[in-house]
């Protein structure tokens, strides 16, 4: 592991769960506000859902999750129901100086393909879920959702 990678791993490992959640919500809120959106943060510190009002007045929901490479993030299908105004934002803590951010429209799960997963969990104790594999091998497929400066702005007009 390079010194730079170790420094980043150490930096992220010092953050508590609530600090990780807050970091992700702050990063995503700043990006949305830079597009002219109004963002209403949840009252609960552990709730990653942001209520957004676009410059045109359209309402949207963004489910934010801060994760490390190698993980798996999921939302129950009961909570994340695909709709044109519903998104997930992944703040990925990797080797870079700043976290990578990905924005996935919830409608992508209507025909999920890797790294997106659609699990019904029939006969299991877990609820049906939509998820995203964050394994290193899945990252190239996740690139299509990368939220860089200028990209994804059309989602929030």
Task: Please give the residue ranges for each predicted region.
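Mixed-charge (Asp/Glu-Lys/Arg
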Residues: 1-46, 52-157
């Amino acid at each position: 592991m390079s010194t730079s990678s170790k420094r980043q791993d150490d930096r992220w490992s010092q953050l508590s769960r609530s600090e990780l959640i807050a970091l992700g919500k702050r990063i995503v809120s700043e990006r949305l506000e830079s597009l002219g959106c109004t963002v209403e943060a949840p009252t609960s510190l552990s709730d990653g859902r942001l209520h957004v009002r676009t410059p045109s007045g359209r309402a949207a929901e963004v489910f934010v999750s801060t994760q490390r490479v190698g993980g798996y993030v999921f939302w129950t299908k009961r909570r994340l129901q695909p709709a044109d105004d519903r998104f997930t934002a992944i703040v990925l803590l990797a080797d870079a100086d700043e976290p990578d951010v990905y924005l996935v429209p919830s409608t992508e799960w209507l025909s999920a393909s890797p790294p997106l997963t659609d699990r019904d969990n029939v006969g299991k104790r877990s609820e049906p879920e939509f998820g995203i594999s964050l394994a290193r091998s899945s990252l190239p497929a996740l690139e299509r959702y990368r939220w860089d400066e200028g990209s994804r702005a059309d989602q929030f007009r």
